[in-house]
From Swiss-Prot:
Associated pathway: Glycan metabolism; plant cellulose biosynthesis
Biased composition (Acidic residues): 453-465
Name assigned to this protein: Putative cellulose synthase A catalytic subunit 11 [UDP-forming]
Entry-linked Pfam families: Cellulose_synt
Enzyme category, top tier: transferase
Length: 860
């Protein structure tokens, strides 16, 4: 290491503070800052009874299906029964963790009275906010600027907030837009604090159609709002000018204002960059108030090094923030997720700083909303149900982490089990690393053993003791560097944070000062591309490499619990509604990540996770294996079309009275369980139906492709990336100094697939079912087989169920728009359906014996 790097200083863990209460009586137990409430027993018991009835009827239904084969369509019958069994097993795995839902309540007034007493400095813990910006070409810089402004204007002590924006593409446009946002923040933040406006993303705030004059707003507020809106319009003009200029990339690359080339002209080969935008000494807003800190970060990238995408960027920010600000908690956001509730950070602190459960809470996952109200079923049903067990899963954004949990430590209850162990025993436990207990043993050893060399004493015995301490010190340092990396400043901050967190209140934020030059140099070092080599980053500490769900899974496996927070006003909201291409691309990425976790040797919930309960494990298995259900679902959606076009059936033609009653009761139990689930979750029926249609579209497209991509990636190491462009586009900017050979080598392990390719399967399914419905009805009317309308009605009902789920997708596919619909997807679908039908007729003409006409004549 460089000689100017900071030395590791001795770290002493302070004794825990005595518990205090709001009344001031030391003997009183402090009031909790949050509580978990169960769903009313009447609603929950009815829901459980409906699920149990559905399970019993499913067992009877499968007994009927297995014992009543269809002789003239044996292959179709076997296929349909196999699909039904597969889908039923998937439903059961996902249903069992959903039997104990819970609701959370936070007490912001108690948080304020405990940590923000009048006349005293705020003792709320420091929070480092990470904003991930991946590609400025797809993510408008105005969206990133709004996200940053909403974070900086949050209702939280300014000295306790530090915002880090990671630019994974090293784009000069992102840097310039953040520079403009930092200047606008000096006026926007005091405006929000003076008037308490919501939301605090200026684009979302000024887009609200509210008549403030009708509400008799104060004249000063109306005047300030008009002036601020005028300034924001000017800010948008400057941002749009930057975006327009960025489309014309100079041949020699971008040049900064001082005449030097932009270091990130080559997005795949550039040095690390860190710039302090807010937080210099004397930085004040227009009202003279303190400003939060804002940093621009772009990690180093070199050919030949794996960068691990978003997880690698988050780990880089975790190390940089530890060196510069070292907040006790970390909140990560995507660049298009704005803070919609200014009290979001306080809501998170109600869980993290809770005197009862705070030491066992690894992260708080917030609900993520958009203007269309999507994902209501996932957040308001599935996440609440997991919250009743060990906690919700991590979904990749809108999550507040404990830094201690990210570093691989175990919760306080597990960490305090063996505090009487000596130093030698500690070393024996931590020599191999990879376990939370070894990390906690190291923490105790670090607090017990000074980290600076002791001076030799005259006494021989003291010299021997000093020599032994130095040997142990070298061993500890080597072990720490193998685990965390070769950065004394980062290692010291890791154990400093633990001592501060164990003090009881999570520590108080330091004053806003500009980082020393030596700290910035160390921060540059910890984001170098070679820093993680031969360390445990991405395997045991930080964000796990292999999928976002794996990060929360590893924490739960160590014994931590998590919390789900969904305040009345959503904490975070998407800047703009996602396009269909972005929806499919996002669904594809999540499904591929889920398959990667399921097939992982380290993070698979099927066998990993020593401290997971059965229901929590089933919740993770359901979350990781959901793409597999796309295989039977796609086949089952195609079966009605096959039956209508061939005159075959997957059910026996003679249905007894008992069989009919069983089928009716099964359908009733399905409807009852869904209705009761919507009742206790308060999810509107319209939102549920929208989620069902989206589930069908993504299951037959993105999830179906993800199954093969996951298997391909696990077997060959080839990753498949999806592009939201319908045609090949030129590179974003020139890669100076990188010839074609190096570029091909960088892309050798990645296959790019356009999003329109995902539309072939759902388009084929809906076209085949529509063709089957039209052909079957026309054939029945033309030939007068009215006695067969009963059997035909069942087939039409199944085909109608498929078409009803995909009709929104079909309307969107054929709707008029600025550009033509993806013709290639429609053509491939029609060709696929036609070829499949002809092959069936060709095979049936040689295999089926000649028979007299019946009411079940093949239509083709």
């Amino acid at each position: 290491m460089d000689g100017e790097s900071p030395e590791i200083m001795p770290v002493e863990c302070p004794d825990p503070e005595p518990a205090s209460s709001e009344s001031g009586d030391d003997h009183d137990i402090p009031e909790p800052l949050s509580s978990r409430l169960s769903v009313p027993s009447g609603e929950l018991n009815l829901y459980r009874a409906a699920v149990a009835l559905r399970l019993v009827l499913l067992a009877a239904f499968f007994r009927y299906r297995v014992t009543r084969p269809v002789a003239d369509a044996h292959a179709l019958w076997v296929t349909s029964v196999a699909c039904e069994l597969w889908l039923a097993a998937s439903w059961l795995i996902a249903q069992l963790p959903k039997l104990s839902p819970a609701n959370r309540v936070t007490y912001l007034d108690r948080l304020a009275s405990r940590y923000e007493k009048g006349g005293e400095a705020s003792r709320l813990a420091g929070v480092d906010v990470f904003v991930a910006a991946a590609d400025a070409a797809r993510e408008p810089p105005l969206a990133t600027a709004n996200t940053v402004l909403s974070v900086l204007a949050a209702d939280y002590p300014a000295g306790g907030v530090a915002c880090y924006v990671h630019d994974d593409g090293a784009d000069m446009l992102v840097f310039e837009s953040l520079f403009e946002a930092a200047g606008f923040a000096r006026r926007w933040i005091p405006f929000c604090r003076r008037h308490g406006v919501e939301p605090r993303a200026p684009e979302l705030y000024f887009a609200r159609g509210v008549d403030y004059l009708r509400d008799r707003a104060a004249p000063s507020f109306v005047k300030d709002r008009r002036a601020m809106k005028r300034e924001y319009e000017e800010f948008k003009v400057r941002m749009n000018h930057l975006a327009a200029r960025a489309r014309k990339v100079p041949e020699e690359g971008w040049i900064m204002s001082d005449g030097t080339p932009w270091p990130g002209n080559n997005s795949r080969d550039h040095p690390a960059m860190i710039q302090v935008l807010l937080g210099h000494p004397g930085d004040r807003d227009v009202d003279g108030g303190e400003l939060p800190r804002l940093f621009y970060v772009s990690r180093e990238k070199r050919p030949g090094f794996r960068h691990h995408g978003k997880a690698g960027a988050m780990n880089a920010l975790l190390r940089v923030s530890a060196v510069l600000t070292n907040g006790a908690y970390v909140l990560n956001l995507d660049c298009d997720h704005c803070v919609n509730n200014s009290s979001a950070l306080r809501e998170a602190m109600c869980f993290m700083m809770d005197p009862v459960a705070g030491n066992r809470t690894c992260f708080v996952q917030f609900a993520l909303r958009d203007s269309g109200g999507g994902d209501s079923v996932f957040f308001d049903i599935e996440m609440k149900c997991l919250d009743g067990i060990q906690g919700p899963v991590y979904v990749g954004s809108g999550c507040c982490f404990s830094r201690k949990a990210l570093y691989g430590f175990e919760p306080a209850a597990a960490a305090d089990d063996g505090d009487d162990m000596d130093t030698a025993a500690d070393w024996r436990r931590m020599c191999c690393f990879g376990r939370g207990k070894r990390m906690n043993a190291m923490r105790r050893s670090m607090s017990a053993v000074p980290l600076l060399d002791s001076e030799d004493d005259s006494d021989e015995q003291e010299e021997e003791e000093a020599a032994g301490r130095r040997r142990r010190l070298r061993a500890y340092r080597a072990a720490l560097e193998r685990h965390f990396g070769q950065s004394p400043a980062f290692i010291a901050s890791a154990f400093e944070e633990q001592g501060r967190r164990r003090g009881g209140d999570g520590g108080s934020p330091d004053a806003t000062v500009a980082p020393a030059r030596s700290l910035l140099k160390e921060a540059i070092h910890v984001v170098s591309c070679a820093f993680e080599e031969r360390t445990r980053w991405g395997k045991e500490i930080g964000w796990m490499y292999g999928g976002g769900v794996a990060t929360g899974f590893r924490m739960h496996a160590r014994g931590w619990s998590s919390a789900y927070c969904s305040p009345a006003r959503p904490a975070f909201r998407r800047y703009a509604r996602a396009s269909p291409a972005d929806v499919l691309a996002g669904a594809s990425r999540r499904a591929v990540a889920a398959m990667g976790i399921l097939l992982s040797r380290r993070h698979s919930p099927v066998w990993a996770g020593r401290r997971l309960g059965l229901l929590q494990r089933l919740g993770y298995v359901a979350r990781a294996s959901y793409p597999l259900a796309s295989l039977p679902l796609t086949v089952y959606c195609a079966l009605p079309a096959v039956c209508l076009l061939t005159g075959k059936s997957t059910f026996p033609s003679d249905v007894s009275y008992y069989d009919g009653v069983l089928l009716i009761l099964l359908l009733f139990s399905v409807a009852a369980s869904v209705a009761l689930e919507l009742r206790w979750s308060r999810v509107p029926l319209r939102a549920w139906w929208r989620d069902e249609k989206l589930w069908m579209v993504t299951a037959t497209s993105a999830s179906l492709a993800a199954v093969f991509q996951g298997i391909l990636s696990a077997c060959t190491g080839i990753d498949v990336a999806f592009s939201t462009e319908t045609a090949a586009s030129p590179p974003k900017r020139p890669a100076a100094g990188n010839d074609d050979g190096e570029e091909e080598a960088a892309l050798a392990s990645e296959i790019t697939m356009r999003w329109t390719n995902l539309l072939v399967a759902p388009t084929s399914v809906v076209v085949a079912n529509l063709a089957g419905v039209v052909a079957a009805v026309a054939y029945g009317v033309d030939h007068g087989y009215y006695q067969s309308w009963g059997a035909l009605g069942a087939k039409l009902a199944l085909a109608g169920w498929v078409v009803a789920h995909l009709q929104g997708f079909l309307r969107g596919l054929l709707a008029p728009r600025d550009r033509a619909p993806p013709t290639i997807a429609v053509l491939w679908s029609v060709v696929f359906v036609s070829v499949a039908s002809l092959l069936w007729v060709h095979a049936a003409s040689f295999s089926a014996p000649t028979a007299a006409p019946t009411t079940e004549q093949p239509i083709l």
